[in-house]
Amino acid sequence: MPKLTLPKLDDVIAIDIHTHAEEPCGLHGDDGYDDFQERMAEYFKSPNKHPPTVQETAAYYRAKKIAAVIFPVDAERETGFRRYNNTEMLQIAAQNSDVLIPFVSIDPHKGKLGVREAKRLIEEFGVKGFKFHPTMQGFYANDRMAYPLYEAINDGGAIALFHTGQTGVGSGMPGGM
């Protein structure tokens, strides 16, 4: 796959910098992800039981002439939900490069494996950013365990985006997530 291209700013009226990349419903088998999404939809009063796919998200933003920074969240270790493969998400986003600006996500707990993946994604795809969700990923942003991954991101010229503050994720569910 060639390096990622970015939307032409003259073709959009705004950029949404916080858009989640979700897989189609049913791909997670019995790991609880679809039930989790259904409960999230109830909490946030969404008319949909599952968030839109990357393709549906692109179509929505394209119709509104808005670009979107889109990313998965690798919270596999903490939640037990299979993560959305970064490479697969990048390939779908590349097909919609007129409106999607893809970031990727790597759980800092992956250690050296995560560092290697970050370097590969930057070198092969030209990834510009990485999304972290400390609550969902079960770490503190200042945990030294994450520093090698941050260094790889910085050395590759990419940025890190952190979810901060309160989160609705897990609200109203057993254990609150």
Give residue spans per PLM region.
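Helix-coil boundary/capping segments in enzymes
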Residues: 1-177
